[in-house]
């Protein structure tokens, strides 16, 4: 019988936004679930998560995570997983 209990880390909800790339066919903001502000900042609204290196050729969002504004808006319920909850895409 396995008695080890894996504890899920506390996750938070963050509003992320950018004002660098604007106009049609761009994301202006998203709500994401992440462990930290830094992790939220590295989350791309189209579900790319990473260091930001792959963002340079991506013209729908900021060029790098440093250009992303982050605001914590609450704690996530235990059943919510990391990632994009919803995003705002300005279609052309």
Which ranges hold each PLM region?
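A short, structured loop/turn motif at beta-sheet edges
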Residues: 6-8, 33-40
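Short, mixed-charge low-complexity intrinsically disordered segments
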Residues: 46-92
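A short, exposed loop/beta-hairpin motif centered on an aromatic-Gly-Thr core
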Residues: 25-35
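A structural detector for beta-sheet-dominated domains
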Residues: 17, 35, 71-73
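His-enriched metal-coordination microenvironments in redox/metal-binding proteins
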Residues: 22-27, 90-92
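Glycine- and charge-rich intrinsically disordered segments
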Residues: 1
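Short aromatic-glycine-(Arg/Gly/Cys) micro-motifs in beta-strand/loop hairpins
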Residues: 4-25
